[in-house]
Structure formats: structure tokens, C-alpha cells
From Swiss-Prot:
The lineage of its organism: Eukaryota, Fungi, Dikarya, Ascomycota, Pezizomycotina. Residues 230-277 are annotated as: Disordered. This is Antigen 1. The keyword Disulfide bond does not apply. PANTHER family: PROTEIN ZPS1 (PTHR39399:SF1).
């Protein structure tokens, strides 16, 4: 009897001892719609995954806008003229529903281009056509769509890569699995894409810059500030036009000087930003 009592007492004391638990990390709710290379650290992966989700959101809204309004949309006609909507719908739909297996975003700078001043990333081209590198600069300069139409941003006066979503949309179109050789670079800047549309040229629905501007403007008009948006420039305030007409002469001189140093695989965007493939 004493032995039984002693055994029960020992069991009770053991059961009362606190058990050591190893906390398990919570599952990250942020899932990237496209593969991210292990060279991206934990914070880069989360930022990039969130940014790619926003890119899909931007493309999906652009597609939905066209599906609902078609050529009756004034914003559609502004960017695509009288071109049929089928091609533009497909260009956005492949971002949303395309197979992501042959796409990879990485952060380890294998080609050394992130060391170049002003580079936020680049498509690897012949080195690895299915891969795009995102440089450190992107993580400190790109904005979320939640800030659309704030902090002075306007569609016409700011670069398309102000937002992660606009920048990554461009980078995705460089990849063969997405652009498929049908989406190319035909126009530069806001004025350039409008000129392309005014001529009703076929390239408008195949131009990566046009696809970015349209997606950003319909998101601003439909979502960020419904029914108003934030186009900026003369379209919002004709009184500002005279103040801005004297500046392009200096910009042209800077562009001419910059063109002498531009590598063959690069082109400049409005504002002088260099984009290389």
C-alpha cells in the first residue's frame, strides 16, 4: 500500500511540472501569386509577395473595367483608341490567370546590374529569360496602391513605376510566359501613349507602357477616388499649362546628353529614368 501511494505521489509531481513548449511560427497569410527565389530574405519576400498580389489586383480591375464598359469607356478610348478590346483584355487576364511556373523573381543580383545607379531591377534576358531581379532600390522607393492619388501623385505627371503594381506589371510583360513577344515597348511616357492611341495604331493594345497607364488610371478613377481619379496636368487644371510649357527645353537637353551613354539593351522613360532588359 505504501509503495502504491509513493508511486502515485511521484506521478502527480511529474504531471505538475511545467512542460516546455516550442512556439511555432504562424503561417504567413501573404501568398505570392508568382514564385520568389530563396535569395530574397524574409522581409523582401513579404514585400515582394504583397506587391505581386497588388499587381494582380491592378490587372484584374483593368480587365473588369474593359469587360463592363468595352469601347464605351472614355478612359479606354483615351489609351487604346478604337482598337478592339479583346487584346487588352487578354493582356491583363494572363497576369491574373496565366501559369506562373515559368516565372521567377530573385534578389541576389547575379548579373551585377543592381550596382548601377538608379536600377530598381531588371529582366535577365539571355542570361535567364524566365527570371527578373528586384534590386534593393525598389524596396525603398515603390509605393502601395493604397496610397493612390495621395502625396501629390497624379497619373500624367508621375512615373508608372511609382507603385509596385505598375512597375511589376511592366516587368512581367518582359517575361516570355506573360508577354509572349506580343507586348513590347512602343511609346514612352504619358504623352507618348496618348499619341499612340490618337493614331489608332495597332501597337496601342500591345504597348506595355499603355497597359500600365490604363490600369493605373482606371484604378484611380474607379477605386481610389471614385468618379474623379487623379489624372493631373491640364486635364484637371488648365491654368497650370502655361507654367509647365517652359520646362521641356531643359529636359530635352538632358535627354540628349543621356542618350549618348545609354547601353543598347536600355531605353529611357519620361523623366529620364533608365530601364534596361
Amino acid at each position: 500500500m505504501q509503495l502504491l501511494a509513493l508511486t502515485l505521489a511521484l506521478c502527480a509531481s511529474i504531471a505538475a511540472l511545467p512542460t516546455q513548449q516550442t512556439p511555432l511560427p504562424l503561417e504567413d497569410p501573404i501568398k505570392s501569386p508568382f514564385p520568389i527565389h530563396h535569395s530574397c530574405n524574409a522581409t523582401e519576400q513579404r514585400q515582394l509577395a504583397t506587391a505581386l498580389q497588388e499587381t494582380v489586383t491592378l490587372a484584374e480591375h483593368a480587365k473588369d473595367h474593359i469587360l463592363r464598359w468595352g469601347n464605351e469607356s472614355a478612359i479606354y478610348r483615351k489609351y487604346f483608341g478604337d482598337r478592339p478590346s479583346l487584346t487588352a483584355i487578354g493582356a491583363y487576364d494572363i497576369i491574373v490567370n496565366g501559369n506562373p511556373d515559368n516565372i521567377l523573381f530573385r534578389c541576389d543580383n547575379p548579373d551585377g546590374n543592381c550596382a548601377l545607379e538608379g536600377w530598381g531591377g531588371h529582366w535577365r534576358g539571355e542570361n535567364a529569360s524566365d527570371e527578373t531581379v528586384i534590386c534593393e532600390l525598389s524596396y525603398t522607393t515603390r509605393r502601395s496602391l493604397s496610397t493612390m492619388c495621395s502625396q501629390g501623385y497624379t497619373i500624367s505627371e508621375w512615373e508608372t513605376n511609382t507603385f509596385w503594381a505598375g512597375d511589376l506589371l511592366h516587368r512581367l510583360y518582359h517575361m516570355p510566359a506573360i508577354g509572349q513577344g506580343l507586348v513590347e515597348h512602343y511609346a514612352d511616357g504619358y504623352e507618348g501613349v496618348l499619341e499612340l492611341a490618337e493614331g489608332n495604331r495597332t501597337e496601342a493594345v500591345h504597348d506595355s507602357e499603355t497597359l500600365q497607364y490604363f490600369a493605373l488610371e482606371v484604378y484611380a478613377y474607379d477605386v481610389a477616388v471614385p468618379g474623379i481619379g487623379c489624372v493631373g496636368g491640364e486635364e484637371e487644371n488648365d491654368g497650370q499649362g502655361e507654367e509647365q510649357t517652359e520646362e521641356p527645353a531643359q529636359d530635352d537637353q538632358q535627354d540628349e546628353a543621356a542618350e549618348e551613354e545609354i547601353p543598347e539593351n536600355c531605353h529611357t522613360h519620361e523623366g529620364g529614368e533608365l530601364h534596361c532588359t
